């Protein structure tokens, strides 16, 4: 019986995607939940990849100073955080945006310990995934050769 290598690899990558989402939630970084919604496993043909929103880099490693984020984004973030139980006044949007523009965001900080992705997708996990994927492909090739 031939193995479905892509299906087996998809199971591994789904677990990785789920572990990254769990890390995001465990670190208390959820505001709107968009990160979890936009964190996707995309499988097509013989390719698979995990995609995430652009701001994953800022969540992981911070944001450099220089440009103030749009006020509407900060207001939306405040509204989302307040739905999660925070009590941030909307009037704080401009001072927050100004501070981000002037100082950036350092990660880790008291609100974000960092490592939302790198704590999960660390060198040991990458090596383990490589070994598991190679094993899956190896057995799929052996199964295919045995069928013929």
Task: Please identify what each model-predicted range represents.
Residues 1-42, 47:
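Charge-rich, low-complexity N-terminal segments
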């Amino acid at each position: 019986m031939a193995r479905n290598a892509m299906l087996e690899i998809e199971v591994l990558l789904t677990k990785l995607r789920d572990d990254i989402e769990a890390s995001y939630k465990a670190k208390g970084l959820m505001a709107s939940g968009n990160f979890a919604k936009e964190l996707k496993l995309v499988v097509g043909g013989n390719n698979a990849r995990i995609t995430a929103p652009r701001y994953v880099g800022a969540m992981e490693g911070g944001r450099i100073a220089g440009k103030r984020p749009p006020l509407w984004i900060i207001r939306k973030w405040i509204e989302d955080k307040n739905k999660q139980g925070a009590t941030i006044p909307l009037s704080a949007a401009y001072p927050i945006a100004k501070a981000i523009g002037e100082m950036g965001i350092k990660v880790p900080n008291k609100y974000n310990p960092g490592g939302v992705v790198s704590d999960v997708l660390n060198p040991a996990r990458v090596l383990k995934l490589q070994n598991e994927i190679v094993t899956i492909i190896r057995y799929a090739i052996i199964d295919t050769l045995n069928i013929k």
